[in-house]
């Protein structure tokens, strides 16, 4: 976290002999602290202009407060021209080898569990697909048997009607009587065939 400023040349000159801050009658303690901060140079390899002068925010606040109390025409932002906020380099602590190894182990376990979960879903889907195909084959065979049964039912009823109609000509002379007799016989045969067909379908559904 930033807590200091990299003092610019403007602030250094203002605090020096004959500088702008000389006539502001800075408190002795504040001047001494500022001179100590600006006189203490901090080496830094990332600074191309040479050693760095660091001034804490607390000293900057004290300086600002003093200037405001004196109603000075010298403003803080003018003194801070060329200054920058100093961000200290964050030193990362060394990682614990045991902790790193434990984290890697946990990552591997989580990856294995995720892989097993994915492959388990795929296996279940394959099994369901195989079961669906098997059930589909049974359903096709059942539908085929049902179609054959219905076809036989229609043929049987039609044959009963035709045979009765042709045979009743020796008993009835009127066509209406012959048709009625043929319908009665065909209905009886149809009901019998329907009963047998329903029982057969119940047996097949029970097997499914």
Curated annotation (Swiss-Prot):
Residue ranges crossing the lipid bilayer per the database entry: 146-166, 179-199
The UniProt record lists the keyword Endoplasmic reticulum: yes
GO terms assigned for molecular function: oxysterol binding
Keywords: Acetylation, Cytoplasmic vesicle, Endoplasmic reticulum, Membrane, Transmembrane, Transmembrane helix
Cellular component, GO, one term: vacuolar proton-transporting V-type ATPase complex
Membrane topology, as annotated: Multi-pass membrane protein
GO biological process: cellular response to increased oxygen levels; intracellular iron ion homeostasis; lysosomal lumen acidification; lysosomal protein catabolic process; vacuolar proton-transporting V-type ATPase complex assembly
Source species, domain of life: Eukaryota
Subcellular location: Cytoplasmic vesicle, COPI-coated vesicle membrane; Endoplasmic reticulum-Golgi intermediate compartment membrane; Endoplasmic reticulum membrane
Residue positions, PTM N-acetylalanine: 2
UniProt subunit comment: Accessory component of the multisubunit proton-transporting vacuolar (V)-ATPase protein pump.
Function: Accessory component of the proton-transporting vacuolar (V)-ATPase protein pump involved in intracellular iron homeostasis. In aerobic conditions, required for intracellular iron homeostasis, thus triggering the activity of Fe(2+) prolyl hydroxylase (PHD) enzymes, and leading to HIF1A hydroxylation and subsequent proteasomal degradation. Necessary for endolysosomal acidification and lysosomal degradation. May be involved in Golgi homeostasis. Binds 20(S)-hydroxycholesterol (20(S)-OHC).
PANTHER family named among the record's database cross-references: TRANSMEMBRANE PROTEIN 199 (PTHR31394:SF1)
Protein name: Vacuolar ATPase assembly protein VMA12
Protein's organism: Mus musculus
Taxonomic placement: Eukaryota, Metazoa, Chordata, Craniata, Vertebrata
Gene assigned in the entry: Vma12
């Amino acid at each position: 976290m930033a807590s200091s400023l990299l003092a610019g040349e403007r602030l250094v000159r203002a605090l020096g002999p004959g500088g702008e801050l000389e006539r502001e009658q800075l408190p002795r303690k504040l001047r001494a602290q500022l001179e100590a901060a600006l006189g203490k140079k901090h080496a830094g390899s990332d600074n191309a202009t040479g050693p760095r002068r660091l001034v804490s925010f607390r000293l900057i606040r004290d300086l600002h407060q003093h200037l405001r109390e004196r109603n000075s025409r010298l403003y803080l932002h003018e003194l801070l021209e060329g200054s920058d906020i100093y961000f200290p380099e964050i030193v990362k602590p060394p990682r614990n080898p045991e902790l790193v190894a434990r984290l890697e182990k946990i990552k591997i376990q989580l990856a294995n569990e995720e892989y097993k979960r994915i492959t388990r879903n795929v296996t279940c889907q394959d099994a369901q697909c195989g079961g669906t195909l098997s059930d589909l084959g049974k359903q096709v065979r059942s539908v085929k048997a049902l179609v054959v049964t219905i076809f036989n039912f229609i043929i049987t009823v039609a044959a009963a009607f035709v045979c009765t109609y042709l045979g009743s000509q020796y008993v009835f002379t009127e066509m209406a009587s012959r048709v009625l007799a043929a319908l009665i016989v065909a209905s009886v045969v149809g009901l019998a065939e329907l009963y047998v067909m329903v029982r057969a379908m119940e047996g097949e559904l029970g097997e499914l």
